[in-house]
Amino acid sequence: MKQNLKENKEEKMTEAYIIDAARTPRGIGKLGKGSLSEFHPGRLLATVLEEIQKRHDLVTQDIDDGVIGCSSQVGKQGSCVGRMAALDAGWDTSASAVTLDRFCGSGITSVNLAAANIMSGMDDLCVAGGAEMMSYTATLTSERNNRTVDGGNLHLREIHPQPHQGICADLIATLEGFS
């Protein structure tokens, strides 16, 4: 068994390539003001998926997976925004999509997961990225009001306190010697 594992380790994995990048226009999306305020987050993501499809004349039936990161999957960004946006963009219903949450690293984790799936041979073609409309997160979404990262688990909070993100960044920089 050990010999088989060693032999498999020496085999080369399929390479994964990023062939394009697209994003939405920057703008203010705060409720009631700004050029993006009336857009649904899924519709905004769908415009990006439509553009990628158009640029490369993609047959969406050939897309093995859409991997989308979104750290606030509630309200308008809930219900697997990656899958809903793919359907909104006109993707074939056989093309799957998933939404994952790794807080601020959700988008890059999605790209990494898509690449890993290709490199392992599980998928041939993936579309990956992130979707987040900050106006629909904690301050304006009633489902998120008073919600904490630990989901209200007081025992977990006791073991792992939740300082503010900015304080965490300063602490990590100090501990790791970044200036």
What are the roles of these predicted feature ranges?
Residues 100-132, 173-179:
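Active-site-proximal alpha-helical scaffold in enzymes
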